[in-house]
Curated annotation (Swiss-Prot):
Designated name of the protein: Olfactory receptor 3A2
Pfam families from the UniProt entry: 7tm_4
Predominant localisation class: membrane
Alphabetized Gene3D superfamilies for the sequence: Rhodopsin 7-helix transmembrane proteins
Keyword check for Transmembrane helix: yes
Cysteine-cysteine disulfides: 100-192
GO MF, one example: olfactory receptor activity
Superkingdom per UniProt: Eukaryota
Organism: Pan troglodytes
Glycan attachment positions: 8
GO cellular component, one term: plasma membrane
Length: 315
């Protein structure tokens, strides 16, 4: 604890992250599991990115967004897992106040970007299926870049808002965070000043950040579903479901865990459920995304096989 300059309060200089397990016997198991998950996630997402870059058939708007999503997945898991692995190796569970805020900022930057990028991908599928004749014009490279740039701008604003709001809170008592990374709900519980305004801000911004994209995604897929029902060929159905089904699975996983995590701030203590949701948000989702998108997509599968076998595309 260190005294705050110009005040009579004391401020927490560092937090203690309790992590996923407290028993020393389980820590090597957790280390191995998370190291494996991290390497699989990095390898899977970089493979998807490489396939998109080298395969001419994948130089399409849908895969441009998928490549961006792969970069986000790598960033999301890198914000939390390497630091946790380092603490397990060094047997030190502390994180400085500044490092905690930095982790909070980058986590919400990437999570916010995920929200908007998934929305852009839904819009892309809407245009491809409902407006096929004008799709290339409506989803030009300029439009793609504008959508990604706007997503980054909105995500940055969201992350900065929460980080600045968090920096106004005072921490002068307990400093044990019942989690394996710094996040809003757990830090709210440790603050010795009122968090009512911060929680209200989280609900308001969360409604905009999650609610608006979710409404746009549902609207897009309502039109897509109506268009798919008019398709008479079995091949057309298969193609629509192969692209839309993967995206819908990722949307359900991402928004489902996110809403559960941030829309239940009334509980007095952080529980193991919060840690489980945190593992899903930061580890499981980024690890599953490459598998989900490649499992139902023969073009991605073919490109990945050619990369692994060292063959060039015939197109």
């Amino acid at each position: 604890m260190e005294p705050e300059a110009g005040t009579n309060r004391t401020a927490v200089a560092e937090f203690i992250l309790l992590g996923l397990v407290q028993t020393e016997e389980m820590q090597p198991v957790v280390f191995v599991l998370f190291l494996f998950a991290y390497l699989v996630t990095i390898g899977g997402n970089l493979s998807i990115l490489a396939a998109i870059l080298v395969e001419p058939k994948l130089h399409a708007p849908m895969y441009f967004f998928l490549g961006n999503l792969s970069v986000l997945d790598v960033g999301c898991i890198t914000v939390t897992v390497p630091a946790m692995l380092g603490r397990l190796l060094s047997h030190k569970s502390t994180i400085s106040y500044d490092a905690c805020l930095s982790q909070l900022f980058f986590f919400h930057l990437l999570a916010g970007m995920d929200c908007f990028l998934l929305t852009a991908m839904a819009y892309d599928r809407f245009l491809a299926i409902c407006w096929p004749l004008t799709y290339s014009t409506r989803m030009s490279q300029t439009v793609q870049r504008m959508l990604v740039a706007a997503s980054w701008a909105c995500a940055f604003t969201n992350a900065l808002t929460h980080t600045v709001a968090m920096s106004t809170l005072n921490f002068c008592g307990p400093n044990e965070v019942n989690h394996f990374y710094c996040d809003l709900p757990q830090l709210f519980q440790l603050s010795c000043s009122s968090t009512q305004l911060n929680e209200l801000l989280l609900f308001a911004v969360g409604f905009i950040m999650a609610g608006t994209p979710l409404v746009l995604i549902i609207t897009s897929y309502s039109h897509v579903a109506a268009a798919v029902l008019r398709i008479r060929s079995v091949e057309g159905w298969k193609k629509a479901f192969s692209t839309c089904g993967s995206h819908l699975t990722v949307v359900c996983l991402f928004f489902g865990t996110g809403i559960f995590n941030y829309m239940r701030l009334g509980s007095e203590e952080a529980s193991d459920k919060d840690k489980g949701v945190g593992v899903f948000n930061t580890v499981i989702n980024p690890m599953l995304n490459p598998l989900i998108y490649s499992l139902r997509n023969p073009d991605v599968q073919g490109a990945l096989w050619r990369i692994f076998l060292g063959r060039r595309s015939l197109t």
